[in-house]
């Protein structure tokens, strides 16, 4: 496995302008450029040779392993025109024209979603050139009229005076407009690298019409870089940097490449603008897809970044990826939706973007149309559905990883002006490493759970209804799904034991135990003397002894991690939590309900002891955590957890909870209206918690992440009575099933 890690690390350290496959279509346009010295020969004869040497058996050019009619015909026609322009390769041209004649009618049958970028602009222009060259194809094909109509619609959306004076996506397809535009104006929109919006074909056309030296330099560099051919777009540096980081994270292997990922994101951050970014640095045109991916990754890694960039893509009540686009791309809206998931409080633009993107994606799902115009991937519908059904505030990392390992493919194909591949984004090495890592962690987790089972069997907890073996498995799953790294084995065990104990105690006092018993348990925790338990019930004695044993054990381990005794701090954690349980019990028995503010301030989630105890075992040295119970991040976690639990309760009419209190304070509301208000309050608290987690502060990041993980766990499994049904399949996928 470590050889795979080093191979990936070498890839990451070699990132530059992007690894991308070559394009026959764009190479054909470069091959058409006449020599700038005035001689009757091509400026790039090596590109002409590449065309003659790379025709496929059926007479077309393109991706050998994937046939799409639009792509193959467009490339075949471009190559045939290039060869005919220089009166060479007659047999190759003849074979290409045979392919075009045979295949052109099939364009009517192909899904227009798979039409290459700018096809409706460049293909009609090439048809006109083919007619001028008297190439033998059927110019009366009905499908051509449809394409001409699409071209007209596109040009109506972006008028020619705009194309010639302002950066738009049509700069990427100027070869389709070369007879009508003013090249003296358009060349002023040239990118710093000499290209026209990083398109080799568009730049080659500009070079033909202007002889611009920077265009020539750009193409010379590309032909040399790609060994006599060119890609459909270059550079793709920001795109590659971002999508690699995204894939590594979703595959669960990013922890091996912390420094390399930081370098990649530092690079992207240098080119971030207040209008967003595109696929390449210094682009005069921004797009919502790359901007969304950059925003989400940068923000989640702690970079200071404003969501105001999304105003660039807001048009009235909707959002677009590009101004003047023909239609929405599923992946663009998918990434916009994902970006909205890292929203901080008050960020209205992200709220609007997320709402729009979700509505669009839900509509596509209902229509069974979750496929995209930019990528042909293994399971895009599954990716989108998982994101819609599992929003970030209710998603556990390892479950998402397990799902994505099944969805990731090493051979995804992207749709640009032609089909292309990104070998550093999609490759078998990533997948092999992800599978090996997941199976390694899963095997370790299984051993840890067996250790927990032995502890459970040796304890007296099984006599209580609330301490079931299935619940033990569920609490361990919550740890394995969030703090899964091999080196955090003690943290997982401590988390599992603490949450298991607190859930069991909570259930006991909800259904069986008396207020006096709870007071006795708290008194015993204060005395902390297993040999002097006082006059209390047998059940309280057992609960205290089991709690005493695990805290003592955790204290011994904690000394090794912290270099000092943490026993007092661990006892205080349990005293605080039990006291909050007592307060809630007293409120339930009282005729006077607390205010919502009082109720939430006093609420301490059943998961709090697990979070605060585990903090000592995640590799960070903590000076003190005495004030953590009153800290903002702890309060936010508890509040968010309590609110989400209350919104899923089955006892809205009788129990003391956020909804009944909210109704009491707002009697004009219906029950459903109060529920909606409390759900909105829960969402706002999750936003606050995310903000607090990502801000720099005295508490180490690894510790803050525990609080966020805990709130997400409570969002995934709100209410102990619903845990079993919802968890069983998740537990199986993460703990029991190896990845094959």
From Swiss-Prot:
It is an enzyme of class 5 (isomerase). GO terms for molecular function: copalyl diphosphate synthase activity; magnesium ion binding; terpene synthase activity. Keywords: Isomerase, Magnesium, Metal-binding. Coiled coil: none annotated. It catalyses: (2E,6E,10E)-geranylgeranyl diphosphate = (+)-copalyl diphosphate. Its cofactor is Mg(2+). The keyword Ubl conjugation does not apply. Pathway: Secondary metabolite biosynthesis; terpenoid biosynthesis. Pfam families: Terpene_synth, Terpene_synth_C. The keyword Magnesium applies. Disulfide bonds: none annotated. Gene3D superfamilies: 1.50.10.160, Farnesyl Diphosphate Synthase, Terpene synthase, N-terminal domain. Belongs to the terpene synthase family. Monofunctional diterpene synthase converting geranylgeranyl diphosphate to copalyl diphosphate. This is Copalyl diphosphate synthase 2. It comes from Selaginella moellendorffii. The lineage of its organism: Eukaryota, Viridiplantae, Streptophyta, Embryophyta, Tracheophyta. The gene is CPS2.
């Amino acid at each position: 496995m470590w050889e795979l890690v080093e191979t990936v690390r070498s890839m990451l350290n070699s990132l530059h302008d992007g690894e991308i496959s070559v394009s026959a279509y764009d190479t054909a346009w470069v091959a058409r450029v006449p020599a700038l010295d005035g001689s009757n020969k091509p400026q790039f004869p090596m590109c002409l040779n590449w065309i003659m040497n790379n025709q496929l058996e059926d007479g077309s050019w393109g991706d050998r392993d994937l046939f799409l009619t639009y792509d193959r015909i467009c490339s075949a026609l471009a190559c045939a025109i290039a060869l005919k322009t220089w009166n060479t390769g007659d047999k190759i041209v003849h074979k290409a024209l045979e392919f075009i004649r045979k295949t052109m009618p099939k364009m009517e049958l192909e899904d227009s979603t798979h039409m290459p970028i700018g096809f409706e602009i460049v293909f009609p222009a090439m048809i006109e050139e083919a007619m001028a060259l008297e190439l033998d194809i059927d110019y009366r094909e009905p499908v051509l009229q449809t394409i001409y109509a699409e071209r007209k619609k596109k040009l109506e959306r972006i008028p020619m005076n705009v194309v010639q004076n302002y950066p738009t996506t049509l700069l990427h397809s100027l070869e389709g407009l070369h007879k009508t535009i003013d090249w003296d104006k358009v060349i002023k929109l040239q990118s710093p690298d000499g290209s026209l919006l990083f398109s080799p074909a568009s730049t080659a056309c500009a070079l033909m019409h202007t002889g611009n030296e920077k265009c020539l330099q750009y193409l010379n560099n590309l032909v040399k870089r790609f060994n006599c051919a060119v890609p459909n777009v270059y550079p793709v540096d920001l795109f590659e940097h971002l999508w690699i980081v995204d894939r590594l994270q979703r595959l669960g292997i990013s922890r091996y490449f912390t420094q390399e990922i930081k370098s990649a994101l530092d690079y992207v951050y240098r080119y971030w603008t207040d209008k967003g970014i595109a696929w390449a640095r210094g682009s005069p045109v921004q797009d919502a897809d790359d901007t969304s991916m950059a925003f989400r990754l940068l923000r989640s890694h702690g970079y200071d970044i404003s969501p105001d960039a999304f105003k660039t893509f807001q048009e009235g009540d909707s959002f677009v990826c590009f101004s003047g686009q023909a239609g929405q791309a599923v992946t663009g809206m998918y990434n916009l939706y994902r970006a909205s998931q890292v929203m901080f409080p008050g960020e209205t633009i992200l709220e609007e973007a997320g709402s729009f993107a979700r509505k669009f994606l839900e509509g596509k799902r209902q229509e069974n149309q979750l496929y995209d115009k930019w990528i042909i991937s293994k399971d895009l519908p599954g990716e989108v559905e998982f994101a819609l059904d599992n929003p970030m505030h209710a998603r556990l990392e390892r479950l998402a990883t397990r799902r994505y390992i099944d969805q990731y493919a090493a051979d995804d194909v992207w749709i640009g002006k032609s089909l292309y591949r990104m070998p550093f984004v999609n490759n078998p090495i990533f997948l092999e490493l992800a599978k090996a890592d997941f199976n390694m962690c899963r095997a370790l987790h299984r051993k840890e759970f067996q250790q927990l089972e032995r502890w459970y069997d040796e304890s007296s907890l099984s006599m209580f209804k609330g301490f079931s073996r299935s619940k033990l498995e569920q609490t361990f799953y919550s740890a394995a799904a969030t703090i899964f790294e091999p080196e955090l084995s003690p943290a997982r065990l401590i988390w599992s034991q603490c949450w298991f104990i607190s859930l069991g105690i909570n259930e006991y006092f909800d259904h069986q135990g008396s207020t006096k018993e709870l007071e006795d348990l708290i008194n015993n925790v204060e005395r902390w003397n297993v040999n002097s338990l006082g006059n209390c019930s047998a059940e309280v004695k057992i609960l205290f002894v089991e709690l005493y044993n695990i805290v003592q054990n955790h204290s011994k381990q904690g000394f090794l991690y912290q270099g000092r005794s943490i026993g007092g701090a661990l006892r205080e954690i349990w005293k605080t939590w039990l006291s909050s349980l007592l307060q809630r019990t007293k409120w339930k028995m009282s005729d006077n309900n607390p205010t919502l503010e009082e109720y939430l301030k006093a609420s301490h989630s059943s998961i709090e002891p697990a979070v605060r105890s585990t903090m000592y075992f995640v590799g960070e040295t903590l000076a003190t955590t005495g004030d953590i119970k009153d800290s903002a991040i702890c309060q936010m976690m508890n509040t968010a957890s309590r609110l989400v639990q209350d919104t899923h309760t089955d006892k809205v009419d009788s129990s003391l909870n956020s909804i009944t209190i909210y109704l009491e304070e707002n009697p004009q509301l219906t029950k459903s209206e109060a529920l909606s208000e409390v759900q909105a309050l829960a969402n706002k608290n999750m936003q606050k918690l995310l903000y607090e987690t990502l801000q720099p502060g005295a508490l180490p990041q690894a510790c803050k992440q525990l609080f966020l993980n805990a709130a997400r766990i409570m969002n995934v499994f709100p209410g102990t009575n619903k845990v079993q049904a919802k968890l069983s399949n998740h537990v199986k996928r993460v703990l029991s099933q190896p990845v094959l």
